Amino acid sequence: MVNMKASMFLTFAGLVLLLVVCYASESEEKEFPKEMLSSIFAVDNDFKQEERDCAGYMRECKEKLCCSGYVCSSRWKWCVLPAPWRR
């Protein structure tokens, strides 16, 4: 009877240990793609900002000219889409 209780306890402890190891491994795997994607997009955004000499949509246009397809709003000093009612 004691031997059966000990074997059940060891089996239960082994399953708990296996669960903890699997959870830790899975959480590491989930973090890796997130870190990889965030580093790719961070580098990509930095590259785009260095490449531009013009201001994009809803960016300040006091010192920079707006990119093609946008006009500088005289009221807000932001680059906006051109429209007939904006003069």
Curated annotation (Swiss-Prot):
Chain's role: Ion channel inhibitor.
Give the species this sequence originates from: Cyriopagopus hainanus (Chinese bird spider)
> Which family is it part of?
Belongs to the neurotoxin 10 (Hwtx-1) family. 51 (Hntx-8) subfamily. Hntx-8 sub-subfamily.
Quote the subcellular location field of this record: Secreted
**What does UniProt say about this protein's domains?**
The presence of a 'disulfide through disulfide knot' structurally defines this protein as a knottin.
Check the UniProt entry and state the signal peptide residues, or none. 1-24
Instruction: Recite the UniProt keywords alphabetically.
Output: Disulfide bond, Ion channel impairing toxin, Knottin, Secreted, Signal, Toxin
Q: In which tissues is it expressed?
A: Expressed by the venom gland.
PROSITE patterns named among the record's database cross-references: HWTX_1 (PS60021)
Keyword Secreted in record: yes
Chain ranges passing through the membrane: none
InterPro entries per the record? Huwentoxin-1, Huwentoxin_CS1
Q: Which Pfam families match?
A: Toxin_12 (PF07740)
Q: Which SUPFAM superfamilies match?
A: omega toxin-like
Propiece residue ranges: 25-52
Superkingdom of the source species: Eukaryota
A GO CC term assigned to this protein in UniProt = extracellular region
* Designated name of the protein: U3-theraphotoxin-Hhn1a 15
Q: Which GO terms describe its molecular function?
A: ion channel inhibitor activity; toxin activity
